[in-house]
Curated annotation (Swiss-Prot):
Name this polypeptide is given: S-methyl-5'-thioadenosine phosphorylase
Function: Catalyzes the reversible phosphorylation of S-methyl-5'-thioadenosine (MTA) to adenine and 5-methylthioribose-1-phosphate. Involved in the breakdown of MTA, a major by-product of polyamine biosynthesis. Responsible for the first step in the methionine salvage pathway after MTA has been generated from S-adenosylmethionine. Has broad substrate specificity with 6-aminopurine nucleosides as preferred substrates.
GO cellular component: cytosol; nucleus
Gene3D superfamilies: Nucleoside phosphorylase domain
Family, per entry: Belongs to the PNP/MTAP phosphorylase family. MTAP subfamily.
Subcellular location field: Cytoplasm; Nucleus
Keyword flag Transferase: yes
Residue sites binding phosphate per the record: 43, 86-87, 119-120, 225
């Protein structure tokens, strides 16, 4: 959190039933409309620039509706990208209430293989000033267990996904130099990499004691959104990279007032413009590298071996439900 815009066009729907519950299922994109890259916009970032609108897709997944309709837009090359606004089209969904399972499931179901997510963050380090960009490579989870953080809970299956490297290392490495180049051209904005993001529950900001504790733990930035988004992307076998924009210094600096919404909003406008420039500048390259298959080698197929429950005792209804995001559960 720390605070993308959509139109209409329904795609054809059918339904399937699980335990007497009927879910609408929407037809996949046509082959020439395959969407490989999804964008999730955070606070202040509600649309993308320099793209041609194609359609809006309204989907209801087995885990409910996404936080916004999915906007499908075309890059100058004709390649398609999908966009979801994490907190809703009008920023009406709190961090704890974001339907992350539906967001990730919807993007996977329409064909996405990689996600570029954006998030406003607070800085826990003096060198990460408001306006700076950060691509983290680690997460400290300080959420409270009230968010739905797995596709497998209650399904009669025990699944342990690999999460030692919570972001796609290859996609991070691919994106970082491109982001840095764009930021220098945009206005000499600083990019930090190799940082750790703390994800807190919210919606209140940190106490000063908490902020100081996160610094001692090795946290560099703090937000309210990366968990469970990153965990669910891993379970759906999607490459996931988070591009963060610093808006404030949280509450750790003695002699300064703790962060306020007013302070955050002052920086959001500039950060959002830079984020749109970054997205417009990297999406084609990300699409191309996904087409070439250079980023998914460590993730694709990994969940097949993460399930420790024997196939013959896995509930059929659960397998059918999970096949929405992991097709091999339909085998």
């Amino acid at each position: 959190m720390r605070l993308f815009h959509l139109s209409r066009h329904l795609i054809q729907s059918k339904t399937f039933s699980l335990n007497r519950i009927t879910f609408p299922v929407y037809s996949k994109m046509e082959n020439n409309e395959k969407v490989l890259v999804g964008c999730i916009g955070g606070s202040g970032l509600y649309h993308l620039d320099n793209l041609t609108f194609v359609k809006t897709v309204h989907i209801e997944t087995p885990w409910g509706k996404p936080s916004s309709p999915i906007n499908i837009s075309s890059l100058p090359s004709g390649a398609l990208v999908a966009f979801i606004s994490r907190h809703g089209s009008h920023h009406s969904i709190t961090p704890s209430e974001v339907p992350c399972r539906a967001n990730i499931a919807a993007l996977k179901h329409i064909g996405c293989e990689a996600i570029i997510a954006f998030s406003a963050v607070g800085s826990l380090r003096e060198e990460i000033a408001p306006g700076h960009f950060i691509i983290p490579d680690q997460i400290i989870d300080r959420t409270k267990g009230i968010r739905e953080d797995t596709f497998f809970r209650g399904e009669g299956l025990v699944v342990h996904s690999m999460f030692g490297e919570p972001f796609s290392q290859k996609l991070n490495a691919f994106v970082a130099p491109r982001v840095e180049k764009i930021l220098k051209e945009t206005g000499d904005v600083v990019l930090h990499t190799g940082k750790t993001v703390v994800c807190m529950e919210g919606p209140a900001f940190s106490t000063r004691a908490e902020s100081l504790m996160y610094r001692q733990w090795g946290g560099d930035i703090i937000n309210m959104s990366v968990i469970p988004e990153a965990k669910l992307a891993r379970e759906a076998e999607l490459d996931y990279t988070l591009i963060c924009t610093s808006t404030d210094f949280d509450a750790w600096r003695t002699g300064y007032d703790p962060v306020t919404v007013e302070e955050v909003v002052k920086v959001l406008h500039t950060n959002a413009g830079n984020s749109r420039a970054v997205a417009a500048g990297i999406l084609q390259d990300v699409h191309d590298v996904v087409v070439e298959g250079k980023t998914l080698t460590d993730i694709k197929g990994s969940m097949k071996f993460a399930c420790v429950t024997r196939k013959d005792i896995q509930p059929e209804a659960s397998r059918k439900k999970l096949s929405y995001i992991l097709p091999y559960f339909s085998d």
